[in-house]
């Protein structure tokens, strides 16, 4: 398996990991860690796809939203000397000497991870960040300076590795400080949404999602899946507007699962949440899928997730089932939908977005 450019840069600096108690946050792939089999390391995963690749035994994880409190949740699995934890956050204090963060796309997400890492390593501990040069590693270095003097350790494969020694002590990470709750209204229905950095449409109602909800079919029945649920915007709206429906929510992100549970609780709702890589590992069938699917992986446009989702959706829908989807107009989804569904209609369109309804 070819390592990601970030992991190739870390492999060049493998001696860095010879000493200390290491933790990794959101490694960019599962395979670099194979080179550290003799070391005891903790790996914090906010993304289920890499977690599942690392542990190689868990295809999906399901949660009752009522079981997820403000304290979060975790799914942990030991693989040799490595402890892998799928979780939205950890509140550890002085648990490690070194934390390696893979640079996320959103600046606010990175700021949150930095704060979490600072409490993990404590005063005089080291935080390391690896990321693509095009992904904002230079601005990341500036953000790191609030914790201490930064040092560029290496640069290769169009990536950089930067280290900061934490100068001051930090209390345990508090997720509540990063939660933002807003009230939205669409078609006469208002509801609250809890979101955090790193979750799609943080602090705002995405215009595409709003269009999808405005044009939502009124002939929904039975079980409905909100794929790539983010903060639970779509599912909570549908449950409030059509309380007879049973909703299921899925996302690859632990932060999304966490925020969705908080959103449901804010609106006195409950549902089953699934952490999964696409629809992999999900076995139950539904009558309808409603989604605003992702088209980015990191900083790059990437249709792979949605292509696979569209082809897999057939197996999750009952006969005559429907999928309602919003997407940027420039994306080639009508043709993809037509390959797998009997009928595909464009039900709404703006200068930026299209809403499609596909029926098996």
UniProtKB/Swiss-Prot annotation:
Q: Name one GO cellular component term.
A: cytoplasm
The entry lists its GO molecular-function terms as: 16S rRNA (guanine(1207)-N(2))-methyltransferase activity; nucleic acid binding
Superkingdom:
Bacteria
What keyword terms does UniProt attach to this protein?
Cytoplasm, Methyltransferase, rRNA processing, S-adenosyl-L-methionine, Transferase
The transmembrane segments are none
EC number per UniProt: 2.1.1.172
Query: What's its top-level EC category?
Result: transferase
Subcellular location, in the record's words? Answer: Cytoplasm
Catalytic reaction equation(s):
guanosine(1207) in 16S rRNA + S-adenosyl-L-methionine = N(2)-methylguanosine(1207) in 16S rRNA + S-adenosyl-L-homocysteine + H(+)
Task: Identify the InterPro entries for this entry.
Answer: DNA_methylase_N6_adenine_CS (IPR002052), Mtase_sm_N (IPR013675), rRNA_ssu_MeTfrase_C (IPR023543), RsmC/RlmG (IPR046977), SAM-dependent_MTases_sf (IPR029063), Small_mtfrase_dom (IPR007848)
- The SS bond pairs are none
Question: What PANTHER family does the record point to?
Answer: RIBOSOMAL RNA SMALL SUBUNIT METHYLTRANSFERASE C
The UniProt entry's sequence similarity note says:
Belongs to the methyltransferase superfamily. RsmC family.
Quaternary structure (record): Monomer.
The task this protein performs is described as: Specifically methylates the guanine in position 1207 of 16S rRNA in the 30S particle.
Q: What is this protein called?
A: Ribosomal RNA small subunit methyltransferase C
Q: Which organism is it from?
A: Alteromonas mediterranea (strain DSM 17117 / CIP 110805 / LMG 28347 / Deep ecotype)
**Which gene name belongs to this protein?**
rsmC
């Amino acid at each position: 398996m070819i390592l990601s450019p970030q992991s190739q840069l870390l492999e060049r600096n493998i001696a860095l990991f010879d000493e200390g108690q290491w933790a990794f946050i959101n490694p960019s792939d599962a395979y670099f860690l194979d080179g550290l089999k003799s070391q005891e390391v903790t790996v914090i995963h906010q993304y289920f796809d890499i977690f599942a690749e690392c542990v190689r035994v868990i295809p999906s994880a399901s949660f009752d939203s009522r079981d997820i409190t403000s304290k979060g949740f975790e799914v942990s699995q030991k693989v040799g000397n490595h402890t892998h934890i799928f979780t939205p956050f950890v509140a550890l204090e002085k648990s490690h000497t070194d934390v390696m963060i893979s640079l996320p796309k959103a600046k606010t997400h990175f700021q949150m991870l930095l704060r979490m890492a600072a409490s993990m390593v404590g005063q005089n501990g080291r935080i390391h960040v690896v990321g693509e040069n095009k992904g904002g590693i230079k601005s990341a270095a500036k953000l790191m300076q609030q914790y201490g003097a930064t040092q560029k350790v290496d640069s290769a494969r169009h990536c950089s590795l930067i280290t900061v020694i934490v100068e001051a002590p930090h209390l345990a990470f508090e997720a509540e400080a990063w939660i933002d709750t807003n009230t939205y209204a669409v078609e006469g229905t208002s509801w609250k949404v809890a979101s955090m950095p790193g979750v799609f449409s943080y602090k705002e109602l995405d215009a595409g999602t709003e269009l999808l909800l405005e044009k939502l079919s009124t002939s929904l029945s039975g079980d409905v899946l909100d794929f790539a649920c983010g903060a639970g915007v779509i599912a909570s709206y549908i449950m409030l507007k059509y309380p007879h429906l049973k909703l299921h929510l899925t996302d690859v992100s632990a932060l999304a699962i966490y925020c969705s549970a908080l959103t449901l609780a804010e609106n006195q709702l409950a549902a089953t949440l699934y952490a999964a890589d696409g629809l992999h590992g999900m076995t139950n069938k539904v009558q309808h899928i409603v989604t605003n699917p992702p088209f980015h992986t990191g900083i790059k446009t990437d249709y792979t997730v949605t292509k696979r989702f569209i082809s897999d959706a057939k197996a999750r829908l009952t006969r005559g089932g429907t999928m309602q989807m919003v997407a940027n107009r420039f994306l080639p989804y009508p043709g993809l939908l037509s390959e797998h569904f009997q009928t595909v209609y464009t039900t709404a369109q703006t200068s930026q977005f299209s809403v499609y309804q596909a029926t098996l």
